[in-house]
């Protein structure tokens, strides 16, 4: 068995989908078709599956009946893997075999490294954000201008490679998150266990930081603000640094209730949905954690 064939046998690629265009998925899969591919589709898109099945030899193709969130789908994907390593990938990220192999080589090269991730570029070849600071430590929007592999506090789980047993050892993915802050919490846990997260300089990927794939504007406003508010509160709760943000949210809740009804009366539905979503997320956090 050649070195490349050996690498392919060690890695399963977990692709998490939600309302993806056929051509977007095809472009992604064409780069990774030699790996064991596990599809987790949170949109239960049977038509997409029927179109793809004849062209690819999937290891598993799972249709979730409802959108369980990126975190739960990632957890699900890990448990479906039979390889030593898993590579998480979203359909809007293009990376070829060679660049995935570079992630594996870096993972094996650096002692105590638990997670490797490529350097992202947009369609025009401009450097875009991946690795950086945890939310509590600074801004996350500025891309790192690397000159070599770099140990970072956190990366985006759009494209990450890890050893399955190692990630399970520290508790795997926390399914209480939906989509936001999941990557930060995992990376923070890795750091707490005195392990490292590496952004690999020579491993390149094209990634267009995407928008929510929800057509209805009111649903999109609710989805973003409900899940972001809960996930943010839960992230800081897990870090035991939630008191400040919780107090700030608590002070606003009564005003939110008033604004919900005022904006309904004034037919400003977007504003009403915004305040409703944040209020509901706060109440969910209280039920989940018992923290007021």
PLM region spans:
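Short aromatic/hydrophobic "clamp" motif used to bind/position activated sugar donors
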Residues: 86
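Short, well-formed alpha-helical segments that are part of the catalytic scaffolds
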Residues: 15-33
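A conserved acidic beta->alpha catalytic loop
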Residues: 41-50
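Short, flexible, basic/aromatic active-site loop/helix in glycosyltransferases
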Residues: 134-153
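Glycine-rich, basic loop-to-helix element that forms the pyrophosphate-binding segment
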Residues: 64-81
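Conserved donor NDP-sugar-binding/catalytic core segment of glycosyltransferases
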Residues: 98-129
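Non-catalytic, C-terminal membrane-associated alpha-helical segments of glycosyltransferases
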Residues: 223-231, 241-292
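A short, conserved alpha-helix in the catalytic core of glycosyltransferases
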Residues: 154-162, 166-171, 176-204
